[in-house]
Amino acid sequence: APYVGMSLYTWTAIIAVVLAGLSVGHWIGGILAPPHVKVRTGLTRAGWALAASAVSTLAILILLRFVASLLMPSSLNPISVIVILSTALFFLPSFFVGIVSPILTKLAVDEDKGRHPGKIIGRMYALGTLGSIAGTLLAGFIFISWIGSVGTVLLVSAVYSALAISFFLIGSVRSTTSYLVLLFLMLSGTSMLGAKLQAFTSPCHIESDYFCIRIDEAPSFAPTARLMALDHLVHSINDSVEPSLFYSPYIHFVDEYTKQRMGNDPPSTYFIGGGGFSLPRAWVHEYKGTANLIAVEIDPAVTKAAI
């Protein structure tokens, strides 16, 4: 959101890239699950796929800063930037996690001794879909609100790591220790690089259910100017000392037009959307509380940040 915003193009690109990664992963997973594959071999391969998923998911936070810094100043159109950024971030994690399902499905069919392959395959499809639904609902309604998008990515990486470890423990008796050490080194190296680049710090000052909110100084306007950015766009610019000083021409126009129409009478106004509350704040100051002003903002975090 802080880089390309949240739009139909953003979600379309992300969904398409994730589905593409899963599709290629399913194909490769089928190749890694031939008829002669043994249970321990299959579980070990699934474990490595999950380990790669954990590392590539953790790397999302690093790649986001790096790739975005290259794409944003470029002359590419916004849709191209969104597609390239989505591919760089989400293809590999989706690809690696897509490998797991065909392998486990093959092992489940073998364990059933081929008596009900259709039932087993249908069950695996159903469980995979239910897992996708559960992950979507938990991320959208709980985890992003609770621990933010960065915390959610770290949590997903931790879950993949835990699953990889469990598959290593079950599938690889002799090589378990070396596998675990290698996984630890991969995760540690990625984590150290991310910490050095401050990739695990959220770019948002406040991450609400609706927006990535940032409050920054705007010295190019005035030493006392402050701006509010919602996602990737500057929403409002206010002066922390003089409420009646407008930096946005359209707000200045509304203020002057209202005074010409209303004269010296205090306005009675209903604001749909508060944002930085530039005009309500100015009119409260100018009319000394005599104006009848109602401002409605859907996001309480935006209101709190503005105040």
Question: How would you label these PLM feature ranges?
Answer:
Residues A1-E207, R214-A225, L230-I237, D255, ...:
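Alpha-helical transmembrane segments of multi-pass membrane proteins
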Residues D239-V254:
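Conserved SAM-binding loop and adjacent beta-strand
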